[in-house]
Amino acid sequence: KNGVDIGQSTVEEVQATYQFNDLTSFLAVYYPAMDVLQDEDDFHDLAAAYFERARANGVVRAECFFDPQAHTSRGIAIETVIRGYHRAVVEAREAGLSADLILCFLRDMSAESALETLQVALPYKDMFIGVGLDSDERDNPPTKFADVFALAREAGLHVTMHCDIDQIGSIDNIRAALTELGAERLDHGTNIVEDPELVAYACDHGIGLTSCPLSNSFVTEEMKGKEIIELTAAGVKVSLNSDDPAYFGGYIGDNYLAFAERFDRSRADLERIARNSIEIAWISEEEKAELLARVDRFVSEN
């Protein structure tokens, strides 16, 4: 559509580039491909296609990350990004899917860039519900962005952040995210199992973990399934999620299936995880009750 040369000319050639063995190799493919997104319709169409797939997978609540700095850094206005995505959110809601956006900061960019991004995004804060932190974790601890997250909390936004698996300093970053920056959830974050005190903290404070088995499987043989099981047994609210599904080859149903088959999980195990995902969602208590009731009905009827 936009005449952008990304180095491949067919779907098969694009898919052949999806060879990842760590976070760095994934990001090397992930960011250049964004160049095809140029106008508001592009962002809308991308999100709308995702929501359609999510609904087909039985998703009833979707909280989706987006990385505005990956676009503003190449000259795309932040309102183009937010408005395009939000149009798709509104349409998804009209079709019966509860959906919201979470604005993420790129941790391998400066804290000043993150702060500027938040400031220019705040006029649109009715279009997103929270902020997160992602990209290359090496030498980019959460504390680098303490002032940014403090401002976000003051603005009434929810807070989460990636604590990617098996990173140098994982436990220190998890501790800082929870105890210093006020994270309500951790994205990935299963290394928390290495510190019993942090596991207890997560249980006591209702911290949710959004784990992604299929993307985990690209960088570790066991998709962190044993950690998911151990944390769930300890009372941590772990959920299963898709992670850049177009790249990692699986939407939410594929993640549930892969985890269940690899670790011989029962219906009750998967039901608990599904309930966790609702209980840690950033929605009203009334909506949580409605969605949990839908789980009850599904379990009783199937």
Q: Predicted segments — roles?
A:
Residues 1-159, 166-172, 178-180, 185, ...:
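Metal-cofactor-binding active-site regions of metalloenzymes
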